[in-house]
Amino acid sequence: MDFYYLPLSAPCRSVIMTAKALGIELNKKLLNLFEGEHLKPEFLKINPQHTIPTLVDNGFAMWESRAIMVYLVEKYGKQNDPLYPSCPKKRALINQRLYFDMGTLWKSYADYTYPQFRENKPADPELFKKFESALEFLNIFLSQSKYAAGQTMTLADLAILASVSTFDVVQMDLSKYEHILRWYNMLKDTAPGAAENWAGCLEMKKYFKK
């Protein structure tokens, strides 16, 4: 299956880690957004929203990283796969964490940092407070269980790991978040695809410094 991606993208990295966990080989197609490759007609035919990651599986195209992660487990995972178990309550908690990562954790990071390195704007203290608030919520979640959505690793961990490792590489101070650090230190080198995730983080760091 074809996978259109950019290594520095946290959402792309979360899909790569999911594929690794499932033993799926992705046909990776680098798409350089900085050179406008996502706006070429051939890619717009695949994804008119022109976003990454984008997956094409036997002619079926989809995007949005967390939707791709769920699709991969539902189609290629084991029955009642621990990454995304069939129990409605367990799935609901995983979904909650995935949506929290997308709509609160990663969004607050992006809202705070992107204007600084994309538009050279000064840091906004109010936006930083929102980012800290998101980290505090995550710290609470991780005080209640070993992993992000229970006692075993799930898709929620892979998505949030892609986010938190990005925070780490750009030197966001996580030292006061005891439970995030415990969880992060447990997974950062051992999660499926951890090495490729970190390599992508280092690419992100280069862009962040420009």
Curated annotation (Swiss-Prot):
The record lists the membrane-crossing segments as: none
Query: Which residues does the annotation say bind glutathione?
Result: 9, 50-52, 64-66
UniProt keywords (A-Z) are: Transferase
Ribosomal protein as a keyword? no
Q: Where is the GST C-terminal domain?
A: 87-208
InterPro entries the UniProt entry points to: Glutathione-S-Trfase_C-like, Glutathione-S-Trfase_C_sf, Glutathione_S-Trfase, Glutathione_S-Trfase_N, GST_C, Thioredoxin-like_sf
Provide the E.C. number(s) assigned to this enzyme. 2.5.1.18
Example GO BP? glutathione metabolic process
What is this enzyme's catalytic activity, as reactions?
A: RX + glutathione = an S-substituted glutathione + a halide anion + H(+)
One MF term in the entry's GO annotations: glutathione transferase activity
SUPFAM superfamilies found in the cross-reference section? GST C-terminal domain-like, Thioredoxin-like
Any idea where the GST N-terminal domain is?
Answer: 1-80
Pfam families assigned: GST_C (PF00043), GST_N_3 (PF13417)
Function according to Swiss-Prot or TrEMBL: Conjugation of reduced glutathione to a wide number of exogenous and endogenous hydrophobic electrophiles.
What protein family does this chain belong to? Belongs to the GST superfamily. Theta family.
Instruction: Describe the protein's quaternary organization and the partners it interacts with.
Output: Homodimer.
Q: What is this protein called?
A: Glutathione S-transferase 3
